[in-house]
Structure formats: structure tokens, C-alpha cells
Amino acid sequence: MLAKANRITSADDYRFIVRRGAKVAGAHSVSYLRSTEAGADARFGFIVSKKVGSAVRRNLVRRRLKAACRELVDDGLTAVDLVVRALPSAAAADYPALRADVATAVSRNRRRGPALAPAATAAEGP
């Protein structure tokens, strides 16, 4: 389970990251990333719509995505906000495939380096 410090909980934060973040498409997900100030905790949010499947299937996909993000935190990932939107194909994907999608999104963000401006708080507005 992700710690509270590693979760995006505000709808405004979700909206801000999805609208202003760098978009990285994977086979089973689309990720939106924003760099944050150095030393800040990495935060994650998940969007799993009914197109993915039944409630049981959606929760399974969400738990797998959370576990993949937890591994990134354990590996020392900091200073990024990441929202992962699961595509319908995620319903049939196994854990390694979902983990690869998330890891690819983060690695592409790291290659871009400081080109992404640090995320402003949702209170600052769009």
C-alpha cells in the first residue's frame, strides 16, 4: 500500500497533472507526469474507468498499478507526480506488463530532465 504522502487525493491535483503534465502512452496505460521540487515525495494517482471491466477487474488493475508504484518509491523515486490512466487492455495485462508501463513512463520523464517545469500547487491555478 502506498503511504498517504505518496498519494494524490485532491481532484484539483488530478486535473492539474493531467492537463499540464507530460503525457506518456504505454501499451496498457497513459501516464501524466509533472516534476516537483527536489526532495519532495513522489505522489501517484490512478484512473481506472468502467471501460476496463467489472469492479473486481478494475480493483485488480488498480492494486497492480499501486504495487508497481510502490516498487518505484522503494527504489528511491522522488520529486514527481504521476497519474496513471488504465486503458481497457489493462484488464487482460499481467503485473509485469503494467509495471513495465509505469517504469517506462518514469524513465522517459527522467530522460527529459529539467525540461519539465516543476508542478505548481493546484491552489496557484492553471
Task: Enumerate the language-model features and the residues they cover.
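Positively charged, solvent-exposed patches that mediate nucleic-acid binding
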Residues: M1-P126
